[in-house]
Amino acid sequence: MKKIILATDFSRNAKNAIEYGIQLFGIQGVNYIIANSFVEPKATTNVVVSMNDLLRKESIKGLKVLEHSLTEQFPSVSLDSRSLYGSIASVIEQITLDEKVYCVVAGTKGLSALERFVMGSSALDIIKNVKLPVLLVPEGSAFHSIERVALAADYHHMEQVQFLSPLIDIISEQDAELKIVHVHKSNETLNDDEASEDMKLHNMFLTLKHEICSELNTDVVRGILAFTERNEIQMLAMIARKHTFFDRLFHKSITKEMTKLSRLPYLVLQE
């Protein structure tokens, strides 16, 4: 049975992301773990102990309310909940000590809070510190059957392919088409190594509907944006690596292009 963590701070945005995740991954053969974290404010020792107990009680209460709401929406869903001390990333890490986790689902706060998202939100904390696939669902995203997914690719050598399993499963279960996109600065012919990596990608997705595409643009973020808009992409997958599209996206100054890309659900894969 797949174990999927649903991160929540009890906000409407988090609830929306949870609903999106359950509709995407389904209820058959899946156990969802709703995770909430709490950290006491800075204060004297006595106040901290008292506040810590209060926060824990409020967290547990919130989880019970959320579980009840979700079981009404999805009657056959398998749910567990965890209320733990620490940042949400550390809480997820604690859960993985006892559970083999397939994926994490978290919400992002949309355009009004994009700067906080890029510069150090809980979602980014999860991506940077938890070595698990993460589905990031933008504020207000409603789930619809997915027909087209893009994978922002580079020519980095991949030793193994197991980390691609969530992407492969989504493409297969949604009967979607995968478009693997490389952004090129010029119309140069691929060298032998690049051609070899393209062939490897083709073989990885051999049983699925897929296409390897090129986008000509001097800026990788603008190139990905142009590609996703032109092809009506509904989900963007990326591999969390340094010095790649992923790194540029999450460390770039806030731009109009980034605000547009933030409207797509992201599937962040950890190699």
Question: Where in this protein do the model-derived segments appear?
Answer:
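Short beta-strand elements of ligand-binding domains
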Residues: A106-G107, V134-E139, Y266-Q270
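Glycine/threonine-rich flexible loop motifs
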Residues: A113-V118, F246-F250
